[in-house]
């Protein structure tokens, strides 16, 4: 059992702007794993930080925790137009992940947001909440401990059939996401390469989710695709950030070399993502028991 004092101490690390960002990230993921109101309160306090990357990750973690207690702060962040688009987008996605009917009205309102990534995210989150409310069941062979923005496509479809839906810009983003998560769950080289083709899509939101999924898969065959988008300085920084973190999850020597080159990128979000990704590479290539090591850091153990 984790004590209140321990949770507050980990929250102190997260909210200490003098600590290295990689330490604050590990503290955040420790709080996510612990859960509960005290952890949510500690995470919520950090939304006044000046790092868009950190705030985006705060919202992501609150969504993954699926605790309706977080809806108040997530709604506030979505409404706050002074927050960076990637932060507001992640708040909307987190509201969809929590899946409570109370969010329908606010998501409907912000589906018309002038920021495209925010509007598209609200539309997908709305579809997810409505899908949950419909009571439909689908076999979800998700091998990852993630709450996805959509369920996989219903029924057994081939890679070719799923790829056709996935790359069809006429389909709704929700249905294209469903096909993507089905391709991910197949986890073959053919399905991974099909997913990688999505990095050429016209929607920055879609490309960023593609990169996230490739990071979950951790398949080296996707490295050249992720590298190309990371190295493109005209690419949306939200996409470049997600490509960097995906390379950090794959964690080969090639990934480390690519990330090291961009660890001083002129875009702060990209630079910080490469630093966090290099820390993830270090973890992936070490005997460390877990990445979210805030508790062991508190008592001095490894």
UniProtKB/Swiss-Prot annotation:
HEAT-like PBS-type repeats lie at residues 23-49, 54-80, 87-113, 175-201, 206-232, 239-265. Pfam families: HEAT_2 (PF13646). Gene3D superfamilies: Leucine-rich Repeat Variant. It catalyses: [eIF5A protein]-deoxyhypusine + AH2 + O2 = [eIF5A protein]-hypusine + A + H2O. It is a peripheral membrane protein. Binds 2 Fe(2+) ions per subunit. The keyword Iron applies. One of its GO terms (molecular function) is metal ion binding. Pathway: Protein modification; eIF5A hypusination. Its EC number is 1.14.99.29. Its main location: endoplasmic reticulum. Catalyzes the hydroxylation of the N(6)-(4-aminobutyl)-L-lysine intermediate to form hypusine, an essential post-translational modification only found in mature eIF-5A factor. Essential for organismal viability and plays a role in a wide number of important processes such as cell growth and proliferation, and regulates induction of autophagy and protein synthesis. Has a role in eIF-5A-mediated translational control. Belongs to the deoxyhypusine hydroxylase family. This is Deoxyhypusine hydroxylase. It comes from Drosophila pseudoobscura pseudoobscura (Fruit fly).
């Amino acid at each position: 059992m984790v004590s209140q004092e321990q949770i507050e101490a980990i929250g102190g690390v997260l909210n200490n702007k003098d600590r290295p960002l990689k330490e604050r990230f590990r503290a955040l993921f420790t709080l996510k794993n612990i859960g509960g109101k005290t952890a949510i309160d500690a995470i919520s306090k950090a939304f006044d930080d000046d790092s868009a990357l950190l705030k985006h990750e705060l919202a992501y973690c609150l969504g993954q925790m699926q605790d309706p207690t977080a809806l108040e702060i997530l709604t506030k962040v979505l409404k706050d137009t002074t927050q960076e688009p990637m932060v507001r987008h992640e708040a909307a996605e987190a509201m969809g992940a929590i899946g409570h009917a109370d969010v329908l009205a606010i998501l409907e309102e912000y589906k018309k947001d002038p920021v495209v990534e925010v509007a598209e995210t609200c539309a997908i989150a709305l579809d997810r909440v409505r899908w949950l409310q419909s009571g439909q069941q689908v076999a979800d062979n998700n091998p990852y401990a993630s709450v996805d923005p959509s369920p996989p496509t219903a029924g057994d479809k081939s890679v070719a059939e799923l790829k056709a839906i996935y790359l069809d810009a006429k389909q709704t983003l929700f249905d294209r996401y469903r096909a993507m998560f089905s391709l991910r769950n197949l986890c073959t080289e053919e399905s991974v390469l099909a997913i990688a083709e999505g990095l050429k899509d016209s929607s920055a939101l879609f490309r960023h989710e593609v990169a996230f999924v490739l990071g979950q898969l951790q398949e080296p065959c996707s490295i050249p695709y992720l590298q190309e988008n990371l190295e493109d300085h005209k690419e949306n920084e939200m996409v470049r950030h997600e490509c960097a973190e995906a390379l950090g999850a794959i964690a080969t020597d090639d990934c480390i070399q690519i990330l090291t080159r961009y660890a001083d990128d002129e875009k702060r979000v990209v630079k910080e993502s490469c630093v966090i990704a290099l820390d993830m590479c270090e973890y992936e290539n070490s005997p460390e028991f877990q990445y979210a090591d805030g508790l062991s850091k508190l008592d001095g153990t490894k």
